[in-house]
Amino acid sequence: MATYFVGDLQGCYDELQLLLERVDFNPTQDKLYLVGDLVARGDKSLECLRFVKSLGNAAQTVLGNHDLHLIATALDIKKVKPRDRVDAIFNAPDFDELIHWLRHQPLLVHNEKLNFLMSHAGISPDWDLKTAKSCAAEVEQILQHGDFHYLIENMYSEQPDRWSPDLQGLARHRYIINAFTRMRFCYLDHRFDFACKSPLKDAPAELTPWFNLDNPLYKQIPIVFGHWASLVDEPTPKGIYALDTGCVWNNRMTMLRWEDKQFFTQSAVKNYSDF
């Protein structure tokens, strides 16, 4: 049995299949973890959704910002962006089933046996393990069983940009969603910056990646995440695994085998900007 992690798919189905063939993935024995953003911009988002769903217990994904946006468009809260190339999902006979399944995916996975945390964007620099898990569960409960329409309709905000345990209601839930699905750079006082998406060397001096801030949790448990394609080939601290290597931006898809920490890569098989 082997455990694999793979970076953002974003509709890049063919590259995923090539990686799974290369590692001889066996869904009856192996497990595949996905860091979220299964959909958007690639040409086979529908195939990605159907495939991951079809794996059942052999796969586990987390929600990414593009996944949440797809749910928002399915609820008629947001309009479909042509560049996202998700029309096939909306025309699919299993559309409702796929959106229901996606909405029931977690924001955070903590595997105590294999000793890892996985989310789409990372873990807030102000959270310990207990807080991260309770915050994820709080929003997951609403998305899966509560007034998810109201939450998704009101989640689009960059405020609050700093954590406080006193946050309540929508402000609290916005921060939680942004931490798990949108976070990249932070100020030294731990405020989020959502404007900068550049490589580390080009970032303003006052900004630092979330994983370089002082949080004991970052050294206690390995963290696997995606979301940040411009981190490709950038060094990260020990135990911090950045797996989004920009396949949909014509770079490559990255897979990590957990047991021996071996990486596998697959270059984009097509120029997605040509579509």
Curated annotation (Swiss-Prot):
Record GO biological process: RNA decapping
Function: Hydrolyzes diadenosine 5',5'''-P1,P4-tetraphosphate to yield ADP.
Protein EC: 3.6.1.41
Catalytic reactions on record: P(1),P(4)-bis(5'-adenosyl) tetraphosphate + H2O = 2 ADP + 2 H(+)
Keywords recorded for this protein, A-Z: Hydrolase
EC supergroup of this enzyme: hydrolase
Family: Belongs to the Ap4A hydrolase family.
UniProt name for this protein: Bis(5'-nucleosyl)-tetraphosphatase, symmetrical
Molecular function as annotated in GO: bis(5'-nucleosyl)-tetraphosphatase (symmetrical) activity; phosphatase activity
One CC-aspect GO term: cytoplasm
Recorded name of the encoding gene: apaH
Cross-referenced Pfam families: Metallophos
